[in-house]
Amino acid sequence: MMTQANAYFYDGADVALLNGQYTDVFSLLGMHSANEGKALIVRCFLRNALSVDVISIKDGRKVASLDKVNEQGLFAGTLGRRVKPFLYLLRVEYPQCQLDIVDPYQFDSLLNSDDIYLFGEGSAERAYEFLGANWRQTQGVEGVHFCVWAPNAKRVSVVGDFNHWDDTRHVMRQHLANGLWELFLPNVVEGAHYKFDLVYQNGERHAKSDPMATQMECAPHNASIVPPKAHHSWNDTAWMSKRAATAWHKAPMSAYEVHLGSWRRKGEQGEQYLDYQDLIEQLIPYVKEQGFTHIELMPISEFPFDGSWGYQPVGLYAPTHRFGDANGLKAFVDACHQAGIGIILDWVSAHFPKDPHGLVRFDGTCLYEHEDPRKGTHPDWDTLIYNYDRGEVRSFLLSNACYWLREFHFDGLRLDAVSSMLYLDYSREPGQWLPNTYGGRENLEAINFLQILNQRLYQAFPGICMIAEESTAFAGVTKPTDQQGLGFGFKWNMGWMNDSLSYLGRDPLYRQFHHHQLTFSLMYAYTEQFMLSVSHDEVVHGKGSLLHKIPGDDWQKFATLRAYYGFMWGHPGKKLLFMGCEFGQRNEWNHNQSLDWHLLAYEPHQGVQRWLKDLNHLYQAMPALSVQDYEGAGFSWLDCENSRDSIFTFVRYGLAGDAPLVFVINMTPQLHTGFRIGLPLAGDYREYLNSDSQIYGGSNQGNAGTVVAESLPWQGMAQSALITVPPLGCLVIGPATGLAEAN
């Protein structure tokens, strides 16, 4: 028997509710006082329900049966003589089953006014704790609190496995003042799939992935996933304490850049990714053995297109499904730390893709992106640029950075494409960009965001490293923010990379005419805190592998590559090398397959790998190679002008008591005997490393491990020695025992 709707519903409210057009659902559904406080009424909307009883959660007793208002599923009824609100569930009889459902519309808002204020201001560092899908408990009831920012939406519902994707079932509570929509849902299980269903002002409906989802489906599917309740138990206290006490600009730092999807694969055809447990067992011991201090991961925020390598993420808070879940990733980071390896994450804050389930026109308006395409569209990648002037967008990004550092214990972030953030005319022709308020080309809002980001992160997470990929001469990238700098800890040295790789590709006969390409970087080496990077970008898109860039036969290629690495590790600045380069991968990097590990069956590749390993271990053992990376006193040319022989000689200095190291690099196949070099100290010297040694695949030309200084001034030094300089080789020479008075 049906009850007239107007007995329980305001005029027309029942129809609006059925059509999904009633947005203030909390004023209608749930438990409400009626008859001037003399009664209680409960209303609910449950499609296909046959009957609904109200059950007290406290004692499990039935309080009342609700009247069926219509066949579409509206139920309502008064609760006898009860006048004081109480917690209840709805016992719902369906054609095939009976379910007990805790009514979500009986709960008050769970949002905190301070959180809301900080989010709108642009300074929220923990927005992920109240936005997205979070396990919460209120009034003794456990459930998932869903919350999303969509200020211009007409209506927002949460849809998912738990409501058969019915957009009218769980319409969310709207907060007009701040644009947030929320709903606390009991009866939701871990792993449930969900989306936010938005009705735009023009009436269009769009299902969107949760911008703050911490887990997502694998492509081509794109639902968000309710996270597990269990969290990883960390065991890296010793590392975190050591990290906080380390001044990384004075410490050895050599990073191994890794694309997790192609470092190594498994399966008969190499069709399967390694999972995090595989990586714990295989990648970490390898990196440790090779002597790298850090791993830098290419982006792992969820991304739909494999070919983007992660640089077009849709789920910025969701670790990609490809290698496991969030707890698996945490276990991997934890294992890195327990092995004494730091881990840096590539972070994409410069742009986002146009995938329709993502951030693009999220609530029917340009919410995350700038509405003017001259400022909001990236011409190179056909992606969208964040509106850094909007407080909520800044909070979204700032909180995301904090999320990876706080929840996953990453040791820093490497920001991709910073140059595109700094300039309004980046890759744009005249007329295609908007000047700033002063008529200039600098993106003042993005600059301010980067300054605040670095300032906040360094303050909140002691010992982290913030690294910028910045390819222009923008001044002050690594200057402190109180000196009007951007506040990064390090900047990739793109100038050094371009010059040195250009030099590497030249015939040895003509390198004498391009000598400056290896010396010029020392003219500006101390203007920023540089990291020398040979990244994935240098071995893709037809550029070929490092080995492929080098002219000559195989012997010359491998010898040149070893000498180049010697120059790189001797040059001031921290180091980054892309995976595969450490053993001389021949083919260009392919993200769809494993590195060519079979090459290590051949001695030349073994030799390069062994050379890199020994360079790294020497780098960590000798303070002269890192402690004064950013001080002029840490480096001195012996001879930077020997273009005729293409030989470079220099000294690296540590602090008082640290042994200096002399580097001699020969970039031609010519063997030099009786070659005199200046030495900073008197006494016997040891040939620490020789890239031409037979163990590295060389011709075994050198100094039999020892060099003796004589009192003959040379190259500005009071001592010198005659040495043998191997062809296409690198020598690293240092005091054999003790230290005498330096010049």
From Swiss-Prot:
Keyword Transferase among record annotations: yes
Protein name: 1,4-alpha-glucan branching enzyme GlgB
Complex formation: Monomer.
Functional pathway: Glycan biosynthesis; glycogen biosynthesis
InterPro entries: A-amylase/branching_C, Branching_enzy, GlgB, GlgB_N, GlgB_N_E_set_prok, Glyco_hydro_13_cat_dom, Glyco_hydro_13_N, Glyco_hydro_b
Gene: glgB
Catalysed reactions, semicolon-separated: Transfers a segment of a (1->4)-alpha-D-glucan chain to a primary hydroxy group in a similar glucan chain
Matching SMART domains: Aamy
Listed EC numbers: 2.4.1.18
Top-level class of the enzyme under EC nomenclature: transferase
